[in-house]
């Protein structure tokens, strides 16, 4: 796969143009695992999975033969509410957005509030257990990517924080009715003019600290999927041994997977100015089918700017905005 994707756009009637959209900040290449190495990895992984499945209920058996879904949600911002207790991830409610207990309940509050903002539809929200970064009884901390900042938000101001994330309140516009069109183009134009503006709303600001680091987050939402819950701490331990300087955390269910060993690897490539805001140059790789037996192999290739397609689900990168 190339570093660029091609998009066809219409510039003028009857004229097509091809534009290049960069996929990544880093010069990645896509490769497949050679058959001989793949066979060895499969053998090692099958032995591990057999032992792991003995701990799991019948309905949650791990199956490494499942086809990998090469699809990720379309999003431009990932908001991660940092847990009060980095060791308490095994007790996260199955559906955080429906939780009643603080701080988990704030995930639902934030998601709901984002729906009323201008740019909230492309925001992912999760809870993250990350050593060294914790929320308190009164204040929440949020790691926001690609801002690459940790924001502190009072628990009573989560709705205001949604306005900040979503670029203000959604425009309030009058919808044109059929009767408006019956009155003619002048009437339609005047209706649009008088109703197109929204009441000016000030977007609040919040204190933050920089987070200029790579981070790997592993799905470990135990009460949502026991497979993830059993496997996540093993993957974190392996990551910490092979990449001791990499920040690692356990994240709540991030959607669209039936196979444990799901990981998002956000790589920080410096800062840039985008829409008058300073944001990180971020490559976010979504990986799956990771086990302690193959994790080092996958990351050794990533360190050489090689993505192994056998484990690749998709990506999010701010390179597409440049």
Curated annotation (Swiss-Prot):
Listed InterPro entries: Aim32/Apd1-like (IPR009737)
Signal sequence region: none
Domain of life, per lineage: Eukaryota
A Pfam family per the record: Suc_Fer-like
Disulfide-bonded cysteines: none
Family: Belongs to the AIM32 family.
Name of protein: Altered inheritance of mitochondria protein 32
Organism taxonomic ancestry: Eukaryota, Fungi, Dikarya, Ascomycota, Saccharomycotina
